[in-house]
């Protein structure tokens, strides 16, 4: 009991130390209260906080410390327990840390910008609008960025499966990801300078364009619509299948086998060799070499796909037996 009272007194004293200040930044009301060097514990210590500048503060055990907050600036602070920023608006965080137990950290929050920050907690950013991350490392990004709208990522590294599911209006530059099933169901997305190790990336996606990137992982892009790769290097077992409107410009396919199966609206310009192509439904494929070309007239109409390739090693009208 005495320890609990001490934590409560510390929180009350810290809140009592607010002093007037004004801080510039994103489109939000200026902050007018400052909290520095506090150690907060217990549930909802700053519930419904407004116009706060919080610096060098630890949010220890206790759920939802800044739930329903508005116009908050966080600097050099850390979250150590669950649900720190739910139903919040107009948030800036710089040089901060989300520890592993600060999971499900930012849900139902609008207009948040995070810079120079380490986030170890999974299941972050759900059903948020207008989220910007700059120079952020997501060490445990499992199930992160689900059902969000308006995402901007720059200089971001992430590790975890199911990143970016069903999110829309996404722009990314200088991005590294290790994790499968990335961007399943994503829509209206532009990616530059990415390096991804991801099986089943971009499944069920729509209106995605990827520039100057490297992607390793089988079954790339299945069931997607309007998927474009420009100046990309891809390695994918049975990748680029079941796609409607696939465009590839100046791309390289490394060790990519059984590509393009049942895809239609293909316009692919590939540098170098494709190891094998199997049963594309319709379109145009240009490459320097195709090692094995499989066109099964019982599965597709071979006349519907134009193959422009000076060197085709083996032509088959049936897929080889497994």
Residue ranges and their predicted role:
Residues 18-322:
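Long, distal/terminal scaffolding or interaction modules
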Residues 1-27:
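N-terminal amphipathic/basic-hydrophobic helices that include classical n-h-c signal peptides
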């Amino acid at each position: 009991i005495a320890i609990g009272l001490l934590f409560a007194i510390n929180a009350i004293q810290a809140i009592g130390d607010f002093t007037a200040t004004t801080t510039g930044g994103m489109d939000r009301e200026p902050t007018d209260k400052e909290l520095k060097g506090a150690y907060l514990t217990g549930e909802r210590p700053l519930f419904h906080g407004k116009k706060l500048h919080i610096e060098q503060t630890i949010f220890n055990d206790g759920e939802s410390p800044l739930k329903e907050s508005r116009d908050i600036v966080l600097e050099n602070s850390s979250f150590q327990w669950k649900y720190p920023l739910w139903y919040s608006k107009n948030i800036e965080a710089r040089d901060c840390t989300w520890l592993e137990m600060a999971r499900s950290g930012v849900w139902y929050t609008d207009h948040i910008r995070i810079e120079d920050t380490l986030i170890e907690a999974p299941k972050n950013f759900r059903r948020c609008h207008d989220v910007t991350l700059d120079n952020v490392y997501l060490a445990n990004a499992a199930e992160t960025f689900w059902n969000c709208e308006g995402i901007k990522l720059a200089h971001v590294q992430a590790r975890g499966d199911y990143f970016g599911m069903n999110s829309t209006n996404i722009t990314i530059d200088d991005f590294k990801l290790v994790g499968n099933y990335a961007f399943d169901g994503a829509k209206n997305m532009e990616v530059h300078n990415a390096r991804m190790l991801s099986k089943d990336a971009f499944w069920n996606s729509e209106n995605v364009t990827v520039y100057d990137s490297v992607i390793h992982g089988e079954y790339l892009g299945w069931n997607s619509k309007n998927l474009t790769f420009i100046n990309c290097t891809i390695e994918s077992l049975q990748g680029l299948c079941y796609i409607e409107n696939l465009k590839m410009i100046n791309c390289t396919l490394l060790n990519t086998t059984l590509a393009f199966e049942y895809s239609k609206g293909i316009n692919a310009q590939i540098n170098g060799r494709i190891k094998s192509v199997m049963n594309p439904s319709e379109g145009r494929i240009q490459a320097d070499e195709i090692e094995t070309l499989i066109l099964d007239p019982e599965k597709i109409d071979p006349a519907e796909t134009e193959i422009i390739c000076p060197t085709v090693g083996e032509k088959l009208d049936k897929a080889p037996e497994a």
